[in-house]
Amino acid sequence: LNDDKKRKAFIERVGEMTLKLRNCAKPVIGMINGVTAGAGVNLMLACDIVCSSEDAKFIQSFVNVGLVPDCGGMYLLKETVGLQKAKELMFTADVISAQEAEKLKMVMHVYTKEDLKIETEKIAQKIAQGAPMAIMYMKKMLNKSYANLKDFLDEEALVQTFCLGTEDCKEGILAFKQKRQPNFQGK
């Protein structure tokens, strides 16, 4: 990448991966096993739920090569761990363990290497049992920034009004009354 236009185009394409993860209508579950560095950490932060093995390690390594984090890493890390901790992790390039990443809420669940895939799949299966449209709207609203609570409540009212008219809502209410699992169809 020997000119600014090419470098900028490359970085923009890399950033698009983050947006695709964040804007995907379905939940994205990250499963981390081993060392995750740089852009890998930032793409992980764009996932909705992250599970890792107990021996996983994470590093914001950009400063070691004279770069700032890409893939929205500064935004996502600050959003996840707070401003000061994000600065510390980026400025120092300290390696953090899976256990520390879990404490910082970068990772939601830590499992043994042997259980990682099975347990992550259990989470995915549990989510898949939910109403697809409701989950899609929850993800969309949780990922969106609102100026204030009133703006959020206005959008919530629109989305909830729509959801109340869906076949999934009718099925969910009927299943609740009949004390059975709902069979959602995404309608």
Regions found by a protein language model. Give the residues of each.
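Short clusters of hydrophobic/aromatic residues that line enzyme substrate/ligand-binding pockets
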Residues: L1, L77, F184
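Glycine- (often His-adjacent) and acidic-residue-rich active-site loop
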Residues: L1-K20, T36, G66, A147-N148
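Crotonase-fold acyl-CoA enzyme core
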Residues: L19-M133, A157, T161-T166, K170-L174, ...
